[in-house]
């Protein structure tokens, strides 16, 4: 049940509130809480110098700042704590606050709790951003006022009073955002679940349980969209409280949306041809099938077809950069898991020179080697995980006698140079790292932009 935002305004006014993390979503949150009359203290590991102008702006607004080394030691004595998504609820600082009687929450939890519009929550190990974007575009095409947020778009909580009951809200939700989510989401989409973020989660089960929160608090009139080709998601119907619909790119029997003979169908109706979809690859067919099911009650087949035939994709996802000396370069920096890299490789019609590696999320790389070797002409590795990935390909050769040439470099510039030196006319070089970027870059966008800069300077 959606609650009246006036309740929150009354609740937060005059409260002693802590906000942990001065990042993209929390900056507008802090300003909004000040506007609502809260006494706000913002916490961050960065110094005032590192934060720059925003620290000065907050001081003018009367926001107290607790910054730098040991900043969480000072997280005590607050009535309300807004945590950053990646902060575990069982962290020492939050446990201390909870024991002191603090109400612990996050920007996304409060947004969903009080949002008047219909909420579509998209989660999964791969395909979240593209599926979220497709759902948003489908609803907008049909004429709905559509808001997009969560991991993408803009922070929405500070706009909550502008969102009307007839509006649609599409959220990309990570496992971190979902770990403490205990509110109803009207339409939940789970694209797939494979090993991911095991550096942050205690184990795979905790990761799965976090994902389940996207539909755990639904009621009988709500909708859950699941991937029938994924071993974990296909069984989620057993725990669903609302209506469940399924999609598959491989079979048609019992499916609510499916792919058959080059065409996409939803509830038995043909929507479009696979070859007419601008963004290529079977993983994008699955993203479209999921999105079609999510919006079926609101969006016409005509609008679905139009978006499929005109939407050119999201930056850093199998994005063509340029062709140099007969070699095509693609940026797939979003691929931060082996399964997402495999999906990207399958979008190409020939084996590619793959640039991979990065931050270690403690996921296995054997699937990349054992399922991807036919699509890899050579692999050039970089980052913290390069030895782990190299070991997976060595194991492939020892066990199956399949050799994939493996090279490695220290920087992105070096691996591009190596790839360029081994490429022949007609080859494809793609950055599809199978890892997060945090060992070398702030995020996957910065990594992708750097790659594009290097390629454009060849």
Curated annotation (Swiss-Prot):
Coiled coil: none annotated. GO terms for biological process: cell division; cell wall organization; peptidoglycan biosynthetic process; regulation of cell shape. One of its GO terms (cellular component) is cytoplasm. InterPro entries: Mur-like_cat_sf, Mur_ligase_C, Mur_ligase_C_dom_sf, Mur_ligase_cen, MurD. Keywords: ATP-binding, Cell cycle, Cell division, Cell shape, Cell wall biogenesis/degradation, Cytoplasm, Ligase, Nucleotide-binding, Peptidoglycan synthesis. ATP binds at residues 124-130. One of its GO terms (molecular function) is ATP binding. It is found in: Cytoplasm. It catalyses: UDP-N-acetyl-alpha-D-muramoyl-L-alanine + D-glutamate + ATP = UDP-N-acetyl-alpha-D-muramoyl-L-alanyl-D-glutamate + ADP + phosphate + H(+). It is an enzyme of class 6 (ligase). SUPFAM superfamilies: MurCD N-terminal domain, MurD-like peptide ligases, catalytic domain, MurD-like peptide ligases, peptide-binding domain. Pathway: Cell wall biogenesis; peptidoglycan biosynthesis. Its EC number is 6.3.2.9. It holds the Pfam family Mur_ligase_M. Cell wall formation. Catalyzes the addition of glutamate to the nucleotide precursor UDP-N-acetylmuramoyl-L-alanine (UMA). HAMAP family: MurD. Belongs to the MurCDEF family. This is UDP-N-acetylmuramoylalanine--D-glutamate ligase. It comes from Clostridium perfringens (strain SM101 / Type A).
């Amino acid at each position: 049940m959606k609650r009246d935002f006036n309740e929150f305004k009354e609740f937060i006014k005059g409260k002693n509130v802590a906000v942990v993390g001065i990042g993209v979503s929390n900056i507008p949150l802090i300003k909004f809480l000040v506007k609502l009359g809260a006494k706000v203290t913002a916490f961050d590991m960065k110094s005032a110098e590192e934060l720059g102008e925003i620290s000065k702006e907050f001081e003018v607004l009367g926001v107290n700042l607790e910054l730098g080394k040991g900043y969480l030691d000072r997280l005590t004595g607050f009535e309300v704590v807004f945590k950053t998504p990646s902060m575990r609820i069982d962290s020492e600082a939050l446990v201390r606050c909870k024991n002191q009687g603090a109400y612990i929450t996050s920007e996304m939890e409060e947004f969903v709790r009080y949002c008047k519009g219909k909420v579509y929550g998209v989660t999964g190990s791969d395909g979240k951003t593209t599926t979220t974007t497709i759902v948003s575009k489908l609803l907008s095409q049909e004429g709905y006022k559509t808001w997009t947020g969560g991991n993408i778009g803009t922070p929405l909580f500070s706009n909550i009073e502008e969102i009307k009951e007839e509006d649609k809200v599409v959220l990309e939700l990570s496992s971190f955002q979902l770990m403490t989510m205990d509110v109803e989401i009207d339409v939940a989409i789970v694209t797939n679940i494979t090993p991911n973020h095991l550096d942050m989660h205690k184990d795979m089960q905790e990761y799965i349980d976090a994902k389940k929160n996207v539909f755990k608090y639904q009621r009988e009139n709500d909708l859950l969209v699941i991937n029938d080709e994924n071993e974990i998601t296909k069984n989620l119907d057993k725990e669903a409280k609302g209506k469940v619909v399924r999609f598959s790119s491989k079979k048609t029997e019992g499916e609510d949306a499916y792919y058959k003979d080059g065409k996409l169908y939803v509830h038995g109706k043909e929507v479009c041809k696979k070859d007419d979809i601008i963004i290529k690859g079977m993983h994008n067919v699955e993203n479209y099938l999921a999105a079609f099911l999510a919006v079926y009650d609101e969006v016409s087949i005509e609008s679905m077809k139009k978006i499929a035939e005109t939407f050119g994709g999201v930056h850093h996802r199998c994005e063509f950069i340029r062709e140099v000396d007969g070699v095509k370069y693609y940026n797939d920096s979003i691929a931060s898991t082996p399964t997402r890299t495999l999906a990207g490789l399958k979008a190409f019609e020939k084996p590619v020179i793959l640039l991979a590696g990065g931050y270690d999320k403690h996921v296995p790389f054997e699937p990349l080697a054992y399922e991807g070797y036919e699509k890899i002409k050579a692999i050039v590795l970089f980052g913290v995980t390069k030895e782990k990935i190299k070991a997976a390909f060595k194991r492939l050769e020892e066990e199956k006698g399949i050799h994939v040439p493996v090279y490695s470099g220290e920087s992105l510039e070096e691996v591009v140079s190596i790839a360029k030196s081994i490429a022949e006319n007609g080859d494809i070089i793609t950055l599809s790292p199978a890892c997060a970027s945090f060992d070398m870059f702030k995020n996957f966008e910065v990594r992708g932009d750097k790659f594009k800069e290097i390629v454009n300077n060849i």
